[in-house]
């Protein structure tokens, strides 16, 4: 096998200690819906507002296949008067929430790859959201783990993990890094609209990490060849999360539904599934099967 073969040599997974079942989510949401409908009864009857429909555990499972999800902080999510996690604000000198969960996943990936901080040249944090714009979460993680070299953040929504892997692959292939640590600290619950029947059940919180390096430098018990990589993007307005630093300049309300995650689920399904299937098939066709000796 060529010395240029690039592999995934270690993976790490962190899951929160808290879970929310469909049944818990439905009880909370339905209580919120009843409260909302009562408070806006006149506007609803006048046709100025739409009533909030009830949900059910059966509806959620049929629509998504999901029965339960992990969340970073459970407090506040199930409170009909709040409907969002209540996460204590940390001082600037403390490790951020997102860096903390990233570090936990990273340590497991390093252990699986039999690597130390001195073996890593770059850190990529790639996820749907970062909790701040700068300093980069990746550089905060780099500092916490004692890694030299460089780090940067990427935001690529649902494809964040795969885009990070491709960037890592390219850096190792180009020789600009011996090994790259990619981390996906998905802290999505603060942007999940728990007041919306059609999306409140979709996301949870998790952090994953991988080590990418050449096979010749790998000493892990298990490693997996990367056969090829290829990226593709198409713009769509059918899935959005509009919160950003312009919210105050726009004189906008950061808590209105427009600024939370929202989607046209059926349209997203029709856009994404054919594209993803075609993309995967194209990669299979251009990849040469590889068997480890």
Where are the language model's segments positioned?
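Conserved catalytic cysteine-centered active-site region
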Residues: 57, 61-82, 89, 93-96, ...
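Flexible, glycine-rich active-site loops centered on histidine and acidic residues
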Residues: 176-207
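Hydrophobic alpha-helical hairpins/lids featuring a short glycine-rich hinge
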Residues: 99-108, 112-113, 128
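Short acidic, glycine/serine/threonine-rich loops at helix termini
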Residues: 19-20, 134-137, 165-166, 191-197, ...
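Single conserved hydrophobic/aromatic residue that forms the stacking wall/gate
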Residues: 285-293
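Condensing-enzyme catalytic core mediating Claisen C-C bond formation in acyl metabolism
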Residues: 1-95, 196-274, 278, 282
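Short acidic capping loops at alpha-helix termini that bridge into adjacent secondary structure
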Residues: 116-122, 150, 178-179, 291
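Short beta-strand segments
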Residues: 9-12, 126, 155, 180-186, ...
């Amino acid at each position: 096998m060529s010395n240029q073969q690039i592999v995934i040599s270690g993976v790490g997974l962190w899951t929160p200690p808290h879970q929310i079942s469909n049944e818990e989510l439905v009880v909370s949401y339905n209580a919120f819906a009843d409260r909302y409908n009562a408070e806006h009864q006149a506007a609803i009857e006048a046709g100025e507002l739409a009533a909030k429909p009830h949900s059910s555990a059966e509806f959620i499972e049929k629509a998504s296949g999901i029965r339960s999800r992990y969340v970073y902080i459970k407090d506040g999510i199930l409170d009909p008067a709040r409907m969002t996690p209540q996460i204590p604000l940390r001082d600037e000198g403390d490790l951020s929430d997102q860096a903390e969960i990233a570090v936990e996943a990273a340590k497991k990936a390093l252990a699986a790859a039999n690597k130390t901080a001195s073996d890593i040249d770059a850190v990529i944090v790639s996820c749907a959201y970062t909790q701040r714009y700068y300093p980069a979460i990746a550089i905060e993680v780099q500092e916490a783990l004692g890694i030299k070299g460089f780090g940067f953040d990427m935001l690529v929504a649902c494809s964040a993990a795969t885009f990070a892997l491709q960037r890592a692959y390219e850096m190792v292939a180009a020789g600009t890094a011996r090994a790259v640590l990619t981390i996906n600290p998905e802290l999505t619950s603060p942007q999940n609209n728990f007041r919306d029947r059609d999306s409140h059940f979709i996301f949870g919180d998790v952090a994953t990490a991988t080590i990418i390096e050449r096979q010749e430098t790998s000493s892990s018990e298990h490693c997996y060849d990367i056969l090829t990589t290829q990226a593709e993007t198409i713009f769509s307005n059918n899935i959005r999360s509009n919160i950003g630093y312009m919210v105050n300049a726009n004189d906008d309300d950061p808590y209105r539904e427009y600024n939370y995650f929202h989607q046209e689920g059926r349209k997203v399904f029709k856009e994404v599934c054919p594209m993803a299937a075609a993309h995967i098939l194209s990669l299979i066709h251009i990849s040469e099967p590889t068997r480890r000796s």
